[in-house]
Amino acid sequence: MKSLIVALAIVLAVAFMTLAERKLMGSIQRRLGPNHVGFLGLLQPFADGIKLILKETVLPLEANHWLFVLAPFLSFYLALLNWLVIPLAKGVVLMDMDLSILLILAISSLGVYAIIYTGWSANSKYTLLGSLRSTAQMVSYEIAMSLLVLTVVYMGATLNLTELAYLNSGTVLLWSLWPMAMIGFVAALAETNRAPFDLPEAESELVAGFMTEHSAISFTFLFLGEYANIITISTVLNLMFLGFYNPLVIYLFIWIRATLPRLRFDQLLRLGWQYLLPFLIGFLMIQPSTLFVLDLF
């Protein structure tokens, strides 16, 4: 029952995040955004959801129908699975595990398979290229994210996300890891395929990327999975570096989408492999030694 309540809460959070995104982007672009459905457009996400659910699901003739239907659901299911170990409030968590951070990393790695299946099962060149782009991007930045988490875990001496959040209430760990928080946010943008790293969904090149052939309920699950991942990774970054919940990270996701242009694919991979990865390896070696010598931690 608790898991069902959390799942419904995440769906509602996704609904209102899309509304906030459209409102904020409208404000940045000097327009109103949704303002007709309900008071100030507050019912717009529900109208969009009902519209998508009532539409007909079109199955491409040459598609692998089983994978085509199941892959979007797998994407959303994996996004929800993380919330088993993420603390919902102080002392409130569905499953308090000592290895909760490790479980989150494992689940995020499995998300690559859902995207591969989504793109391959449609038997379309656009969906396949979009899924391959997304896979290469996620694998590249998954390494950076893993090293980032390793550094934080090394400093906090725990793999329990709840304990790490309490530990971050102190200022020493927080300020010493401030550069890592910036890199973590960049890696989070790439992990969730958000601007300026939204190459898997580049409309001018790949129509809608790996979601091109999906419609109705299958598109709804892909959409829910994408935005649920944004909420999940924003929450994890908050707990790892700030020690509390702050909507600022989600606001930055939206603000950057409205302001920054899309990178080229070679620029994206170069940033991950030639800049972020060496910096993280160097930081992993230097930071603990520096704090030990200065007797700060």
UniProtKB/Swiss-Prot annotation:
Q: Please state what class of enzyme this protein is.
A: translocase
Membrane topology per the entry is: Multi-pass membrane protein
- Give the E.C. number(s): 7.1.1.2
Alphabetically list the UniProt keywords: Electron transport, Membrane, Mitochondrion, Mitochondrion inner membrane, NAD, Respiratory chain, Translocase, Transmembrane, Transmembrane helix, Transport, Ubiquinone
Q: What PANTHER family would the database entry show?
A: NADH DEHYDROGENASE SUBUNIT 1 (PTHR11432), NADH-UBIQUINONE OXIDOREDUCTASE CHAIN 1 (PTHR11432:SF3)
Q: What does this protein do?
A: Core subunit of the mitochondrial membrane respiratory chain NADH dehydrogenase (Complex I) that is believed to belong to the minimal assembly required for catalysis. Complex I functions in the transfer of electrons from NADH to the respiratory chain. The immediate electron acceptor for the enzyme is believed to be ubiquinone.
This protein's name: NADH-ubiquinone oxidoreductase chain 1
Question: From which source organism is this entry?
Answer: Hyaloraphidium curvatum (Lower fungus)
